[in-house]
Amino acid sequence: MLHYLLSVLLLIFENILELCMCITLVILIYYFWPSKQLEDATLQYFPDTTQNSSEVFIDPPERNPIFYPISPLRHKKRSSKEEMTPDKKRDSSEKISKQPPRELFEPNEQEQVPSHIKPEIFFVLKALEGLELPTTWQLDPKDVETLSIDTGSVVLSPGRANDVIVVVISGELGIFTNVSLGDKRYDCNIKTLRSGESYFSQTSIIEILMNEKPNNKYIHLKALTSCRVATYHLTSFHTSFIANPQQWIRTIQVVMTRLQQCTLITCNMYLGIGGKCLNAKRKLPDSGKFKDFNKLTEAEQLNKGVEAIAQAMGIPDQSDKLREKVRKYECQAGTVVTEENSFEIDMIFVVFGKLRLKRGDLEHDDTGTSLTFDVYPGDMLPSMQILTNEPAMCSAKALEKTIYFKICRDEYIQFLFAHPVIYLRLAFHALQFISPFARVFDMAVHWHRIETGQALFRQGDKSDSMHIVMGGRLRAVDSTKIIEEYGRLDLIGITDMAEKRPRRNTVMAVRFSHIVCIPENLLSFVKIRYPQVGNKLLKLISKCWKAPTPETMSHVETTRNQNLRTIAIVPASRRVPLTEFTCELYNQLSKHVKTLRLSSSVVENYFESEVITKKADYGLMHWLNVQEIAYSLVLYQCDFHKTNWTRRCLRMADAILMVALGTESKEEQVLAEALLSCNEKGVRQSKELVFLWPIDTPTPSGTAAWIKESYYSGYHHLRAPNRLFSFPLKTREKKIVEYYETTVYGEISYQSDFSRLARILTGNAIGIVFGGGGARGAAHAGALRALIEKKVQIDMVGGTSIGALFGSLYATTPDIRAVGRMKDFFTDRLRNNILDVVRDLTWPYCGILTGHRFNLCVQRMLNDVNIEDCWVSFFCITTDLTSSSMRIHRNGIMWPVVRSSMSIAGYVPPICDPQDGHLLLDGAYVNNLPADIMRSLGANVVIAIDVGMSDDNTNLRNYGFSISGTWCLFKRWWPFGEELRVLNMNEVQNRLAYVCCVNQMEIVKNAQYCYYVKLPIESFGIFDFSKFDQAAQIGYDITKQKMEEFFEDSVATRRKLLGCARNVRQTPQKSKNDNILSFVNMPVLPKPPSDIKSD
């Protein structure tokens, strides 16, 4: 009875107390609400949008910091006709930043057959286009024959000469070969040809030029449907070669390069059957004439060796000239004669003993076939390397005492120039090393040469092949979104092919690219012959497979600076110190990757001047492609004029850096746009802005003016050292390079802005994300201080809620001063007296506070700085209530989005986004620790600082279906009895903030790229702003301890966090020779001069 009476009294007391609180609140609002001032401020910054929709948002003046809308009740309500439509919201957003151009996402239209050319002629010319045939050769339309083929009819059968091109005009044609299954043999379709596609054996061209009959032993063509085909016989090639042999050198080189890239590299690197490409049953050279060679005198050895070399090179009448160039060498067993990946392309002719060729450390491929190959007396090497002008695929080691003759590179180039038949003989000799299986594979594989903007395939196309990028860069797009970009040796489309579904995305060429296309039917044939290939393909699929993009990340804009091989550097004005900038950047890049700097003056040292000025030169093009193989990153420095070199730089670039002076306006720097227009193919690469500022610049400014006019995928602000601006504008490039070589190169400051840019470009960027947690975020200050003391580099920063504020403070002042600014924010919050708090109270329609004092506090810390004007790249997370999604903010005025990221529901109202009018709330509700977003924006490693509270579910009271707050308050004050453990409103809010991102947090904790730091500060409340020092000390101690653990984990981890990680990319060795000669526009790779030599 007593218990019942006490409950009734408490209920009455609770109702009376609530009534009194409401009356007090109404009185305080009536007397202290600054209605006139707030109404004026609201009208000043949020004018009536019904009069002028273009004035939805006006930047606040510097000396009158007000706030965003206090409450929707304070504004004129729009009628249904005045509601902002999605189109109007989008228009408003576009005024803040330029939207990506359609060229980034839409490929060119498919090439159509011209009306003035017959389809059969057009398709034959397209099939021959990639061979780069000499201009002296012309196609005679009379030699093209058109045939109508019934279903099942055979067009080409084994035993016939393989000297014909077959092009499908309509219908389908199958390429078949025999395969054994048990005791039976079956016809296996290794490729299906459709309209516009062709069949011909490119290796047969070498035999045709040698006037040999290329026999077809393994292939037959059969019509899968009724079709029309065009045939053209290649016999005219030999006639043209006899008349102009020098002009066919480039075609021979293209054929052999295609063989190496399409067949040899593919089978070895991706299918694991490199040993099957070697012809173990090849006809060995006649070694009898070299019997007892070591017993001959020196003069006899030289005479006999020179005669044999001249005979092998096809110039027996030039023995006397060769004798002056040839040098004899002897080596013992175990001596390495040539190195793998070397550009030492001196020609070697073995006359005694035996050499063994070997690739890598493996003795056998996945099928158990030996990867070694023996070279006997009478063999020349490295013939394939000489032909393709690419690094050696194998090393050569002596198995016994060996005698060989060598002709240095410069000498035999002279012979090649004078006697082009040598080049053809080398190619014919190299084909003797290729197995019949490799030849069949080479006939079915296709080598695409795709111009900028062309589509490799389109969304919805049939997935019947996989592709390998051998050169260039491609981009996968989906409507208006970049999915992925692909560089050299990347795989494309293998997952779609494995899942047998239509292409999910469109893949287009960002620049001129070389692609190897492997049909699904060919892979099935290979798996039948060598089942071990299936395991290799599964590994490739597992590496390429990616989980579907979460909805919360579907709109993340990324710069995709992954696997960059070439970068074009374009000046925004003639006053930009371009050479100095390129040298500074080169110096920092060289500590991460093997880098080459090329400018027009550098290339002129190796080529005739007319080569640089020509619009198209295949020799220079090939030479530049070889540099991409030899170096991990090539910097192309453009000219200050619209020259062919500038055009070539833009065409060869994976990405473009536009360098501008931060102290000058955009109107004064319009040169870059003019230079970009000289690329008639259009600019489809990612284009990023780089602003150069004096070293003592406090804060950048003016970036918004650039991004309003043109789209840039990123922007970087660099505080340049004084030496960058010390040279007069007309100083010769050679003088500047000499200064950097003698004074600067090797001097690395990992804390500099140039070093930060180098890490971003090489994929070594370090990002840090600060999590939300209210006043517990004070621990972020201690964590940041520990990171700075440990010299951990921070290249990108992001955060949620209180972490967004701390991240923004570091982004604008990237040094220890940011810690002091964090403390100032907490001190500012403590200055609010009771009267200020009461004045900020309002009727709890959107929140119990107007947000006015909160706005002033945040804006006082950040002023009117734009996000794009930060020294360090910054983003923050908010919850978009209008679209029920996560928002990632990377541009616009900083303080409103930071404030919205800290807006706890129920306490302060959401902020109306000035760009589109969406309601934004605390980002902790969707992603409290956005390490995954930081990773998607290009960070290689992410340091995640978590100050969220851990769930403590122990001793929670099971109070049933209802509970009285007054009873809980009474129990808290009552000193007798057991403690009542019930979640209060703050605790409920905290837990709600983590409900939606629990799974994401677990993924982040276990991610290999993430270095997770959990700060144990659960004892602090989210409004304990008076305990800054205590929380900061805990953050400092724990973070320092965790960093020491990470450093001790491995040397690689330490180097990553300190910003000095070096990319592990296997790159060929440089040549040791200094001189270079060119022959028929095909120079070999020279040693880079001192001004471009990498450390």
From Swiss-Prot:
<feature type="binding site">
    <location>
        <begin position="450"/>
        <end position="509"/>
    </location>
    <ligand>
        <name>a nucleoside 3',5'-cyclic phosphate 3</name>
    </ligand>
</feature>
<dbReference type="InterPro" id="IPR014710">
    <property type="entry name" value="RmlC-like_jellyroll"/>
</dbReference>
<dbReference type="Pfam" id="PF01734">
    <property type="entry name" value="Patatin"/>
</dbReference>
<keyword id="KW-0472">Membrane</keyword>
<dbReference type="InterPro" id="IPR001423">
    <property type="entry name" value="LysoPLipase_patatin_CS"/>
</dbReference>
<keyword id="KW-0443">Lipid metabolism</keyword>
<feature type="region of interest" description="Disordered">
    <location>
        <begin position="75"/>
        <end position="113"/>
    </location>
</feature>
<feature type="binding site">
    <location>
        <begin position="327"/>
        <end position="416"/>
    </location>
    <ligand>
        <name>a nucleoside 3',5'-cyclic phosphate 2</name>
    </ligand>
</feature>
<feature type="binding site">
    <location>
        <begin position="144"/>
        <end position="237"/>
    </location>
    <ligand>
        <name>a nucleoside 3',5'-cyclic phosphate 1</name>
    </ligand>
</feature>
<dbReference type="GO" id="GO:0016020">
    <property type="term" value="C:membrane"/>
</dbReference>
<dbReference type="InterPro" id="IPR018490">
    <property type="entry name" value="cNMP-bd_dom_sf"/>
</dbReference>
<feature type="transmembrane region" description="Helical">
    <location>
        <begin position="9"/>
        <end position="29"/>
    </location>
</feature>
<protein>
    <recommendedName>
        <fullName>Putative patatin-like phospholipase domain-containing protein M110.7</fullName>
        <ecNumber>3.1.1.-</ecNumber>
    </recommendedName>
</protein>
<dbReference type="InterPro" id="IPR002641">
    <property type="entry name" value="PNPLA_dom"/>
</dbReference>
<feature type="active site" description="Proton acceptor">
    <location>
        <position position="922"/>
    </location>
</feature>
<dbReference type="GO" id="GO:0046470">
    <property type="term" value="P:phosphatidylcholine metabolic process"/>
</dbReference>
<dbReference type="GO" id="GO:0016042">
    <property type="term" value="P:lipid catabolic process"/>
</dbReference>
<dbReference type="GO" id="GO:0005783">
    <property type="term" value="C:endoplasmic reticulum"/>
</dbReference>
<feature type="short sequence motif" description="DGA/G">
    <location>
        <begin position="922"/>
        <end position="924"/>
    </location>
</feature>
<dbReference type="InterPro" id="IPR056556">
    <property type="entry name" value="NTE1_P-loop_dom"/>
</dbReference>
<comment type="similarity">
    <text>Belongs to the NTE family.</text>
</comment>
<dbReference type="InterPro" id="IPR000595">
    <property type="entry name" value="cNMP-bd_dom"/>
</dbReference>
<keyword id="KW-1133">Transmembrane helix</keyword>
<keyword id="KW-0677">Repeat</keyword>
<dbReference type="Pfam" id="PF00027">
    <property type="entry name" value="cNMP_binding"/>
</dbReference>
<feature type="short sequence motif" description="GXGXXG">
    <location>
        <begin position="772"/>
        <end position="777"/>
    </location>
</feature>
<keyword id="KW-0378">Hydrolase</keyword>
<dbReference type="GO" id="GO:0004622">
    <property type="term" value="F:lysophospholipase activity"/>
</dbReference>
<feature type="short sequence motif" description="GXSXG">
    <location>
        <begin position="799"/>
        <end position="803"/>
    </location>
</feature>
<feature type="domain" description="PNPLA">
    <location>
        <begin position="768"/>
        <end position="935"/>
    </location>
</feature>
<keyword id="KW-0442">Lipid degradation</keyword>
<dbReference type="InterPro" id="IPR050301">
    <property type="entry name" value="NTE"/>
</dbReference>
<dbReference type="InterPro" id="IPR016035">
    <property type="entry name" value="Acyl_Trfase/lysoPLipase"/>
</dbReference>
<feature type="active site" description="Nucleophile">
    <location>
        <position position="801"/>
    </location>
</feature>
<keyword id="KW-0812">Transmembrane</keyword>
<feature type="compositionally biased region" description="Basic and acidic residues">
    <location>
        <begin position="80"/>
        <end position="105"/>
    </location>
</feature>
<dbReference type="Pfam" id="PF24179">
    <property type="entry name" value="NTE_Ploop"/>
</dbReference>
